[in-house]
Amino acid sequence: MRFFLKLAPRCSVLLLLLLVTASRGLNIGDLLGSTPAKDQGCSRTCESQFCTIAPLLRYGKYCGILYSGCPGERPCDALDACCMVHDHCVDTHNDDYLNTMCNENLLSCIDRVSGATFPGNKCNVGQTASVIRGVIETAVFAGKILHKRDDGQ
């Protein structure tokens, strides 16, 4: 029973990811005919909101689903820098949010996060990193499944 309870949160995220017919489906802008970052603006402010709620998480300028800093904006701290590099990687791979290399690099970067956070941060960096890790681990798993299917394997 404990095994299934541990899997429940990941299974719900995995189910959501599997319902997406293409890896680009995570980009809501594709469904709406526009890119959220272009229409809603990009972040120039270090934020710390919804720290443990993955779909709503806003951390620094770059961490969060469909949330990113403006071009040229410096990250707020080490965790935010990991998210900035991940955002750039995803951008250079056709907005493929399930790109295994980008996601595994983010996980490695999160493992190395240390140092001070930004002034006014209301999030516990370790908890926030754990939330991001859970989402990205699920994306790695889904990416491996969906990309095998896309490759005809």
UniProtKB/Swiss-Prot annotation:
Bound cofactor: record note: Binds 1 Ca(2+) ion per subunit.
Primary localization class, coarse: secreted
Disulfide bonds: 42-70, 46-76, 51-123, 63-83, 82-109, 89-102
Keywords assigned: Calcium, Disulfide bond, Hydrolase, Lipid degradation, Lipid metabolism, Metal-binding, Secreted, Signal
MF terms in GO: calcium ion binding; lipid binding; phospholipase A2 activity
GO terms under cellular component: extracellular region
Statement: the UniProt record of this protein carries the keyword Metal-binding: yes
Active site (record annotation): 86
Cofactor: Ca(2+)
Subcellular localization, as worded in the UniProt entry: Secreted
Gene3D superfamilies: Phospholipase A2 domain
Record-listed E.C. numbers: 3.1.1.4
Top-level enzyme category: hydrolase
The keyword Metal-binding appears for this protein: yes
GO BP annotations, alphabetical order: arachidonate secretion; lipid catabolic process; phospholipid metabolic process
Residues that hold Ca(2+) according to the record: 62, 64, 67, 87
Signal peptide location: 1-25
Catalyzed reactions: a 1,2-diacyl-sn-glycero-3-phosphocholine + H2O = a 1-acyl-sn-glycero-3-phosphocholine + a fatty acid + H(+)
Its biological purpose: PA2 catalyzes the calcium-dependent hydrolysis of the 2-acyl groups in 3-sn-phosphoglycerides. Releases lysophospholipids (LPLs) and free fatty acids (FFAs) from membrane phospholipids in response to hormones and other external stimuli.
Similarity comment: family membership: Belongs to the phospholipase A2 family.
Full protein name: Probable phospholipase A2 homolog 2
Provenance organism: Oryza sativa subsp. japonica (Rice)
Gene name linked to the record: PLA2-II
